[in-house]
Amino acid sequence: MIWLKNLRVPILLAIILVVYNEYFIFFIAFSSCQWPCKYGRCSESSVKAFMISDTHLLGKINGHWLDKLKREWQMYQSFWISTWIHSPDVTFFLGDLMDEGKWAGRPVFEAYAERFKKLFGDNEKVITLAGNHDLGFHYAIMPETLEMFKKEFRRGLIDEMKIKKHRFVLINSMAMHGDGCRLCHEAELILEKIKSRNPKNRPIVLQHFPLYRKSDAECDQVDEQHEIDLKEMYREQWDTLSKESSLQIIDSLNPKAVFGGHTHKMCKKKWNKTGNSEYFYEYTVNSFSWRNGDVPAMLLVVIDGDNVLVSSCRLPSEILQIMVYIFGGIGIVILAFILISRRVRIFKRRPSYSLLMYRSQEKCD
C-alpha cells in the first residue's frame, strides 16, 4: 500500500494517457471536420452523407488477433464518434467491407457480416456495396458468395434508391467486366432499363472500383494533406473499371457525381461529357483503416439540388498516437522511478536516525 501511494500520480497519468489516445484524439480530429454546406448552413432538403471505403475487417488467414483488435477498435471509435458529432443522414460503405470474404464459407461469411454490423450498425442509415475482397475479382466470383452477400447486406448487382428525392445508383464493380457473362449481361440490362426511363434528376453513382484512369496523375488534390502518387500505373479491370465500362456508366446514367474506393488513395477527377458542356466530378475515397495507411480518411458529402459539395475528413494519425504512447510512457516511467528512489532514500535514513536517538538517550541516563 505504501508503494501504491507513491505511484498514485504515475498511475493517474497512465490512465489519462490511455483515455486521451483512445478517445480524445478522435474527438479532436472529427471536431475539425465540417459539412461543406452552401453559405455555412445545410437546407432541410439536402442529404448529408459519409462516404467510407475499404474497412477490410481482418479474417483468420491474414489477420493476427492483436492487429484485428487494434484496427477494429480504431474504426469503431472513428465511426461512432464522427457520427455523434456530425449526425449524417446516411453512411455509404463503398466495398471491401471484409478482407477475406472471397474465401469464406457460409458460417465464416455470416460471422464476418455480424462483426461488420456490430461495428457500424445495421439499419437503413448504413448502406453497403460489394468489393473484390468481399466477393472476389470478376473471374473468381462464386454464385454462393454473391447470394450470401445479397442476403446479409441486402445488395444486388445494381440498385437504385432515393433519399430525400435525390437519386443514388449503387453498382457492383465486378459485374462491369463487359465480357458478356451472365453477371455482366444482367448488370447491363439493368443499366439499360434505368437509361430508358430517362429520369430528369441526375443520380449519384456509387461503386467500389474507380472509373478508368491511367494513374493518379489525372487527379486534383482533395485537401492539403493529399499527396498525389505520380508513379503507380493502374490496370484496367483490376485497379479501375475498363474504359468501355466507364463510358457505358457515364452514357447510361449521366451522373452528377461518382464515388468509389479500392485504390486506398484519395482522388478528385473532373469528367467532361462529350457533345455538351455538362461535367461531373469523380471522387476516390481513401481506406478507413490504419492498416492501409497512416492517415485514413472519409468524405463528408452534401447533396443539395444539383450541387454535390465534398470535403475530406482525416482520421487521427496512427504514428502520432504511437509517438504519444512512447514519449508519454517514458515520461511516466521516469517519474515513477524518481518517486520510488526518493521513497527508498527516505526509508533508509529512518533506521539510522532512530538508532542515534536511542543511543543519545542512554548516555543521558
Curated annotation (Swiss-Prot):
Gene Ontology CC terms: endoplasmic reticulum-Golgi intermediate compartment membrane; Golgi apparatus
Cofactor(s) required for function per UniProt: Mn(2+)
Main location: endoplasmic reticulum
BP terms from Gene Ontology: GPI anchor biosynthetic process; vesicle-mediated transport
Record keyword Manganese present: yes
Ranges annotated as spanning the membrane: 10-30, 319-339
Bilayer topology term: Multi-pass membrane protein
InterPro entries the UniProt entry points to: Calcineurin-like_PHP_ApaH (IPR004843), Metallo-depent_PP-like (IPR029052), PGAP5/Cdc1/Ted1 (IPR033308)
Cofactor: binding comment: Binds 2 manganese ions per subunit.
Molecular-function GO terms, alphabetical: hydrolase activity; metal ion binding
Binding site for a divalent metal cation 1: D96, N132, H208, H262
Keyword annotations of the record: ER-Golgi transport, Golgi apparatus, GPI-anchor biosynthesis, Hydrolase, Manganese, Membrane, Metal-binding, Transmembrane, Transmembrane helix, Transport
Keyword set includes rRNA-binding: no
EC annotation from Swiss-Prot or TrEMBL: 3.1.-.-
Residues that coordinate or bind a divalent metal cation 2: D54, D96, H264
Summary of the function given for this chain in its UniProt record: Metallophosphoesterase required for transport of GPI-anchor proteins from the endoplasmic reticulum to the Golgi. Acts in lipid remodeling steps of GPI-anchor maturation by mediating the removal of a side-chain ethanolamine-phosphate (EtNP) from the second Man (Man2) of the GPI intermediate, an essential step for efficient transport of GPI-anchor proteins.
Protein family: Belongs to the metallophosphoesterase superfamily. MPPE1 family.
PANTHER family in the record: METALLO PHOSPHOESTERASE RELATED, METALLOPHOSPHOESTERASE 1
Protein name, UniProt field: Metallophosphoesterase 1 homolog
This protein's encoding gene: mppe-1
